[in-house]
Each structure stands twice: as structure tokens, then as C-alpha cells.
């Protein structure tokens, strides 16, 4: 069910020593009623045409949208997904770079990590024009993220804006903003599982969650030391020599 939702503001964190996230420029925000679509024309078999509006500044090249079971790059060869909504080895994985050029790989292995996190291995590295997303560097307390804005994606290749409601040791949950000023929000439903959510840090998308539950959305929190430890071990099991990239919030 669609509903107008507009976020209070986007936030950028300035360093790991900052006590509070700082407000980002309004240039980071979509216009009221602006289309949430990432693609103007999407193609599984060929190149795509990207939207020319605000969503063009959000680098979604590291997200594979060719199936509802979305995959998100965390190394040049590893992708994460919802464990309860996995793709299978042998499946084709299609990305589109920021110019809309199609890039294909094959999924050759998938293993569960912890909770609702699974990691997959591609048959070869992706090129540097695809985005590999950083995860939040662990910190003692993430509670200051509560009330800030996250970019939340869905199965129909769109970007929405929800507030962070809570951050636990291994999970994070979102809510719809009470005050609507920018962009759209949506109630997440069946089929949205595994789609990623991001926090904006110094103009970069940092992966914080993949959907497990609907409504405002909730799922595993990728700033969790436990999840990062288990994920790193699984990455090494599938193909050694790759490391997660972490970014301080």
C-alpha cells in the first residue's frame, strides 16, 4: 500500500569521533513527489536507462535487481542476501553500472552466515565501475542513529526514505516519518526481503540492513561485530583473500 512519506532530513556523519550525526545539505534530498524509480527503463537481458532525477545520485550499481531475491556487493566477488529468500548456485546475477551498462556474473556458491544473512560467491570479480558497499565500523553505541534517515530499497527497483526506529546488537528497524517533507516511503511486503537499506555518510551509501520483515522494515544490522565476524569468516570460506570494507559513522 502506497502512502506519501517524506523524510525529516538526510544525515551525514562526519567522523567516528562525532557525538551526533550532522545534517546533510538539502541537495541530498529528493523533491516532494519525485519518482522513487532507479531506472527509467530496466532490462535483464540488455543495457538499462537510468532515471535522470535525484535517484541518479544514489549509486545502486552494486545491487543486483534481476530477480526479486536481491543481491548486494560487499566485496568484488561476494554478495549478501536474505537467508530466507536466497538465490541458488547457477543463477545469473545481473548488475547495471551508473551508465546503465549490463554486467553479468554467475552465482557459484551460497552459504548461511548468521540469522537472516546469507552470502554468495560470484564466478569472477566484478569490474571497478560497480559499487562495493562499506559496512558501518563497529562502535560502542549506535543509538544516536535513532530518528535519522535511511535510504530503503524495494523489489520494484525504487528508493524510499524511512527513519531509523531502533538499533540493537544484531538488528535494526525502521519506521515511517511522522512529518513528510521529501520523497516517498512504502510499507514493505512479501518480495521485498533481502533488499538493502543504506545510511548516508559523507556522501557515501553505507550498507546497514537487508530486509527480513515488512511494514517500515527491519532486518540484520551490518554494524554488528558478531555479524561482521561471521560474514568475514563465510567470505573466506567461499574465496579467501577478500575483506569487508568498513566506514565510521
Role assignments for model-derived ranges:
Residues 20, 25-51, 71-86, 171, ...:
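C-terminal subregion of chymotrypsin/trypsin-like serine protease catalytic domains
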Residues 75-76, 80-115, 125-127:
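Catalytic-histidine neighborhood of serine endopeptidases
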Residues 4-12:
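Sec-dependent N-terminal signal peptides
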Residues 22, 117-192, 200, 211-233:
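Chymotrypsin/trypsin-fold serine protease catalytic domain
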Residues 44, 53, 62, 66, ...:
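A structural motif
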Residues 94-98, 153, 198-200:
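A generic structural motif
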Amino acid at each position: 500500500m502506497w502512502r506519501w512519506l517524506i523524510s525529516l532530513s538526510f544525515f551525514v556523519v562526519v567522523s567516528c569521533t562525532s557525538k551526533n550525526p550532522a545534517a546533510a545539505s538539502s541537495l541530498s534530498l529528493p523533491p516532494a513527489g519525485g519518482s522513487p524509480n532507479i531506472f527509467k527503463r530496466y532490462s535483464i537481458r540488455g543495457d538499462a536507462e537510468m532515471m535522470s532525477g535525484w535517484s541518479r545520485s544514489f549509486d545502486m550499481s552494486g545491487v543486483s535487481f534481476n530477480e526479486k531475491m536481491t543481491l548486494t556487493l560487499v566485496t568484488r566477488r561476494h554478495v549478501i542476501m536474505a537467508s530466507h529468500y536466497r538465490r541458488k548456485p547457477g543463477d545469473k546475477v545481473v548488475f547495471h553500472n551508473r551508465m546503465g551498462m549490463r554486467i553479468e556474473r554467475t552465482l557459484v556458491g551460497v552459504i548461511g552466515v548468521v540469522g537472516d544473512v546469507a552470502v554468495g560467491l560470484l564466478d569472477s570479480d566484478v569490474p571497478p565501475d560497480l559499487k562495493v558497499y562499506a559496512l558501518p565500523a563497529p562502535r560502542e553505541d549506535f543509538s544516536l542513529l535513532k530518528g535519522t534517515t535511511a535510504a530503503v530499497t524495494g523489489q520494484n527497483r525504487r528508493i524510499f526514505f524511512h527513519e531509523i526506529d531502533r538499533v540493537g546488537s544484531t538488528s535494526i528497524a525502521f519506521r515511517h516519518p511522522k512529518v513528510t517533507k521529501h520523497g516517498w516511503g512504502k510499507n514493505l511486503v512479501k518480495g521485498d526481503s533481502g533488499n538493502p537499506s543504506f545510511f548516508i555518510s559523507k556522501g557515501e551509501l553505507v550498507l546497514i540492513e537487508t530486509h527480513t520483515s515488512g511494514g517500515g522494515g527491519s532486518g540484520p544490522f551490518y554494524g554488528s561485530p558478531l555479524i561482521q565476524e561471521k560474514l568475514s569468516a563465510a567470505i573466506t570460506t567461499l574465496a579467501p583473500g577478500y575483506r569487508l570494507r568498513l566506514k565510521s559513522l
